[in-house]
A protein has these predicted regions:
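Active-site acidic/histidine proton-transfer and metal-coordination neighborhood
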Residues: 1-51, 63, 151
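Structural motif corresponding to the early beta-alpha repeats
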Residues: 2-6, 14, 110, 115, ...
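Alpha-helical scaffolding segments of alpha/beta enzyme cores, especially the outer helices
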Residues: 3-10, 14, 36-40, 44, ...
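Hydrophobic faces of well-ordered beta-strands that scaffold small-molecule active sites
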Residues: 19-21, 50-54, 78-82, 116-121
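Gly/Pro-rich active-site loop or hairpin
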Residues: 28-35, 39, 58-115, 123-132
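C-terminal helical cap(s) of enzyme catalytic domains, especially alpha/beta-barrels
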Residues: 129-151
Length: 151
């Protein structure tokens, strides 16, 4: 796997694009499931075009700090999947409809000056009517961002 990521990273460098590696839940993967796994990968694959991201459900499910990704990955922390979840489950819920403290996370992201990308991730429960759920997710996210003082 390390060799493959090195090769993909070298190719990404030639194209001047980033290869973004996502830690998944233990239900989805046994390779990269925590921030420390990504730190170890970046130690072994020293390539500025290989970066990491945080889908906030995996750390939440594993009782790992979401903000640890920012602390541990530093400038390699390049993207976020913002979604909500419930304790002990990897089910992805619309932001604001689960137990993840998203408003507080947004406040902390603002406080540390995170200025890279983030997307809302809608999967599983929302596949049949994505337009309905996307609108609700965007509306909820706008409200959470306003409460966190971002907009």
């Amino acid at each position: 796997l390390e060799k493959n990521i090195q090769e993909l990273g070298d190719y990404a460098a030639k194209l001047e694009i980033k290869l973004v590696v996502e830690a998944l839940t233990p239900y989805e993967s046994n390779f990269f499931t925590r921030a420390n796994d990504l730190v170890e990968l970046f130690r072994r694959v020293d390539n500025p075009y290989v970066v990491g991201m945080c889908d906030i459900v995996p750390p939440f499910v594993q009782h790992e700090s979401i903000m640890a990704y920012f602390d541990k990955l530093g400038n390699k922390m390049d993207h976020m999947h913002i979604i909500d979840g419930e304790n002990g489950s990897d089910t992805h819920l619309i932001p604001g409809e689960g137990n993840i403290p998203i408003k507080e996370m947004l406040y902390e992201m603002k406080r540390i000056g995170y200025d890279k990308t983030a997307t809302l991730e809608l999967v599983t429960n929302y596949i049949n009517e994505p337009r309905f759920y996307a609108k609700r997710a965007i509306d909820n996210m706008r409200e959470l961002m306003a409460e966190a003082g971002i907009v």
